[in-house]
Amino acid sequence: MTTEFSYLTFSVFEISDFNLFIETVKVIFKKQLITGKAEIYSEIPNPNGWVNPQSGGSHFPKFSCWQNKIYPDKVFFISNYEEGLFNVCRIIQKHLRCNIITCALSDETETDNPFFKFYFSNSNLEERLIQAYKEDRWIFYEEGKPLSFENLDYYKRRRITDRLNNNIIKEYMIRLGIDINTIDAQIKAGIVYVRKKW
């Protein structure tokens, strides 16, 4: 995955059956697909084309999902919405009853409002959320039971930007067996969902 971005949000579903994932997406968006308000294209996506998504919700949502040879038991998800179409991901997860991870990373030198997020939900829908973001000031927020791989000492640091940042998120992902730099490598299957009308 590219390291040159202002903002990047993606999700990871722990599921090996990509066809089941696609069928679940089709069920969730059945009405939009039948009425021609949306289309699903079977294609190998270019995830780097989805970095720096737009903020707000005035544009038509699009998202891309793929599976690669490096992580055959994972499906990756990225969208054209700054918040990563998080609610869509949660709906998919509830249908599949699988683990999901959502990460948001920022380049503090490129954006006025950096946002860092690590979210994990297991198949029982138990949630863990950690966030550090800047509005008028820096804010750190966490909820849910800490996971075994977390370093809780990070959250005691004085500077909020040292409690959760790109490096810590990447570290946590490595501990979960995922190198962010390789999630878009050796893609073997993918789809793109495009909403065309409201």
Language model: regions and residue ranges:
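Short, extreme N-terminal segment that most often corresponds to the first beta-strand
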Residues: M1-T35
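Surface-exposed, low-hydrophobicity interaction/linker segments
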Residues: V27-Q54, S123
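Charged interaction segments
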Residues: P47-W198
